Amino acid sequence: MPARGLLSLTIAVAVTALASEVPPPETLARLEAGATALETWPGAFTLTTRAVISKPDGDDREESVTVMRMTGGPAGPEVKEIVSAIRGGKDVTAEARGELEKERKQAAKGADEEKKDEDDEVGMTLPGGKQTGKFAFTALPVADGACGAAFAPRAEHAKEPGLTTGELRWECTTLDPLWLTARPVKNPKGVKEMTLRMELVRTGEMIYVARTVTDGVGGVLFIKRKFHVETEIAELAPAGPAAATP
């Protein structure tokens, strides 16, 4: 075989191998770790939540901004302090702190009931870890310097609850995940439509979700509401060595 033909064949094989690794295993491993990194991270951070709820046409708009100081740990994230809370332009920090204290007391008395409520919830299953095999990926063109792939459930898993379809972007050189958008294949009860965007960043050896944006429409019967919720993580203060990301 001529050298030029051999070179072309080698390149073709390399491209085929690369295509079969979209997204790269390293990216998916870091995505899985980053999605839950702060839940058990031994440190504190600030969580700011901005929410806008309105009728589908935008009327009866209700806005709120809550800033909380959080900690991670073996039992999961915990609210240590409500720094501030604004609802409809009014400072309701004192009321929010009172509600938090009431919830803590109720949780201490009815932990089993709370767990039952959590078990009834259906989350959004994203690619990563053991869930990766449930998804099929399609490579996307590089955009703004980021490699990407679209994902959707494989046919044999299409009817499983909680699965999503969407797009994942990662840094082409470092393979760090940058952002992901997803929407449920089948919407949860009471939700007509919903999309999620997660943005990840690296600090030292740890990758974590720094920002999320959730948009959707939900409700019951003839009562429908449009919702837009943003969360941002800031002011990370490790209590010890930061958790490493693969």
Where are these regions (language model features)?
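Bacterial N-terminal signal peptides that target proteins for export
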Residues: 1-8
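Mature extracytoplasmic/lumenal regions of exported proteins
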Residues: 166-168, 178, 182-185, 196-198, ...
